[in-house]
Structure formats: C-alpha cells, structure tokens
Amino acid sequence: MHFLTSEEMEKAYLSGLTSENDMYPEVYNENVYGKAAMTACSYGGKLYGYPVSFNTSFLVYNKKYAEAVDTIDQIRNISDNYQITDENQDVSMVFEWDPDSMFLNYAAAGAYINIGGVNAENRAEVSLNEEKIKKVLTKYAQLKDAFGIDRNTVSLKDCADLFSTGNMLYTVLDADSLAEINVTDVDYGICEYPSMGDDLDSKAMSVTTMAVVNPYTKNVDASKAVARAISYDYADYLGSMAKKSCARADLKVKRAESYQKLHQIYSDSVVKAKYIGVGEVYMRYEIMLHQVYDGGNVDTAYSTFATTIEKTTKNNNENSTQNTK
C-alpha cells in the first residue's frame, strides 16, 4: 500500500500500481466522502483510491465579531466602515489573505475554467469562459488598492497566525491551516471563497490524499483492509494526530457546523486535474493572477493565458496520440 495525491492518479494507474477499490461499496461512495473525493480517487470509470485527507480553500470568519459573506464587495464595505469599540478592540485587521497563492485563489475564476472535464482526467477537454474570467480578473486587480496587500510580503501562515489569535475578522485559508485554529478558543465559521461580484461565482480547487493498494503485494485483500482502516475505521484520528482534514464527511466532531460546511465546499470543489502534464496549466493561471494583481492589463494577461492553454492542450493531445500508437 502507498499514498499519493489525486493529481498523481494517472501516473500511478499507467505504472500499474493501482488495485481497484472494490471490497467495500457501502463505505466508499458520495454519501460518506462526497463527490470530489470519489472523483479524485477514480480513473477511467473505476475507483482505486481510499480517500484519507484533503485540502481546499475557503473564507474563514471570527463568529464573535463577523458573519458569513458571499462577495468580496461585502468585505470591502465592512472594512471601509469598521469602527473600533470596547467590545472589538482586540481586532487589528478586518481582512488579509495571501494573493500570491494559486491554490488559495484558484477559486476566484474556478467556476469558469474546465480542465480535464467532469472527471478531471480528459486532457482534450479544456475550456475557458472568457467573459466571466475577465470580469473576475478586473475585480481581482482592484484588491491590491482596496486592501493594500503586497503579495510578496503576506503568507498563508501569517494570516492563519493572526486569525488564530482573534485579531482578524476574515481571511482565506486552506484546510491544512485549520489545525492551528482548532487548538485555540476562536469561534470561527466557514463559507465559500468570496466571489468577485454579485453576478459571479467562486469555486475552490481541491486535492485529495489517498491510500492505494499495490496489485503486486502478496496479500491484496489484507492491504485493502488496512487501507479501509486508515481511511474509514480510524479516520477520526487523522485530525487529532496528523493535523489533517479527514476526507470522511460523516464523523461526529467538536466543531460540527464548520466541519459540515468545509466538507460541502470540498465535495463541490474542482478536482485538480489528474493527467500527466497538466502542471503547466496551473502555473499559467498563477502567472495570470500575479500579472493583473501587480497592475498588468487584464486583456493581455488573459490572452497570454488562453493562448498558452491552447498550445499546452494541443501538445498533450499529440503526445497522448503518439503514446497510444
């Protein structure tokens, strides 16, 4: 048995290192783990992985002083009108986040980018909604002036540290960062990454870590039982011992409301594409975000991104065709 992330699924499958997850259908389904987990752990229509943990991005807020929001404009309005009182004097910042991270901010335009199709594995299926993405980029470019955040000086850890002390109202985190907050007394809520406008949606990316059984092992059934034990039977130990967000969605936990919301976001998320060579696409998305945030022209940044995606997709298709001959 070995562990891998969902983006490594195709490589593992083509290397012959995946044995089908077929012994426990009553356990490994969307009712227990959610849609994204099942998609991430599958390839070619068959389930191979045993989902263990996941990572995704979302907005977290301090429930003592703040409420859930839907859009970035709502946060801007709160920031512009926020007043310090005796009750909230511990708060030193309304909102800060890491604008440099592709993974955190994929959600900004994630609803309008299709990479790999519904199963995140078809290299021939890549599509972009130009109109919507440009609207997202236009608003994203305004955030630097709105919040005065230099993307080169603010990190995810900085934001998690500040939020965990109760000194910030809102920030964007990933699931791995929750371990730091869960050991504090901060009463927090979780909601989707804020959309860039009332007429726009956000959709976070997720990566799933899974156990996979090697078909060449001496006892495949025993290995499958161990994979089940790790990902299901003893899944509740993952958060307390490994400080990871458990992929199993039906556990009873201390912060049940936040846990359920996090799993809803995870289940509905965009699964990071699983095919070999897709890394170039995400790197180009990150570059596009950086360009517009730093003051670059939106049309130019998008055009460069779209052209590169088209070329990369074409090259991937040609390589795939050659490999099948």
Question: Which positions does each model-derived feature cover?
Answer:
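Short glycine- and hydrophobic/aromatic-rich loop-to-beta-strand nucleating segment
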Residues: 57-60, 211-213
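Glycine-centered hinge/linker elements that transmit conformational signals in sensory
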Residues: 122-153
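A ligand-binding cleft/hinge motif common to bilobed small-molecule-binding domains
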Residues: 7-13, 173-187
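Short helices/loops that flank or line small-molecule/ion binding pockets
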Residues: 2, 15, 80-84, 156-171, ...
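Conserved C-terminal helix/tail region of periplasmic/extracytoplasmic solute-binding proteins
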Residues: 263-325
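Extracytoplasmic/periplasmic solute-binding protein
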Residues: 46-52, 57, 76-125, 168
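Extracytoplasmic/periplasmic substrate-recognition and gating elements
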Residues: 183-243, 287
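Hinge/lid segment of periplasmic solute-binding proteins
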Residues: 3-58, 73, 190-194
